Amino acid sequence: MTNFTDGTTSGVVTKDMTNLGFKQLQVRVPDTFVWGTDSLIIDLTDYGAVDLAGVLAFEETTEGSVTIQATEGTTSVTSAGVATIVSGGDGTNGGTFLIWAY
């Protein structure tokens, strides 16, 4: 299992949705990400948040191509503002996580 952080991804894009009470983060993981095994660790405090409101994960079927929603048991836990997210699915592919935090 590999722990991917915002330093080992393609970066984090943020959108401040203050009127709705949360921030949206978009995190791109590289094609070496092993779905169902690897985890994504994000320090939410770096982005002005402390807890998760929701997570969606999209896995690429082929590099840079079609994405499918990884619906097979995406799990997460937050401790001291650090979110650890493990997505379901299988295969070694790139993908995108959409994270809503407050």
Language-model segment annotations:
Residues F22-Q26, G54, A80:
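Short, hydrophobic/aromatic-rich segments at coil-to-beta transitions
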Residues T37-D46, I85-V86:
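Exposed aromatic-hydrophobic patches
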Residues M1-S39, N93-Y102:
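Extracellular receptor-binding modules and their adjoining Ser/Thr/Gly/Asp/Asn-rich linkers
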Residues S10-T18, V66-T78:
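Short, exposed beta-strand/loop patches in secreted or surface proteins that constitute
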Residues F4, G73-Y102:
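Surface-exposed interaction regions enriched in Ser/Thr/Asp/Glu
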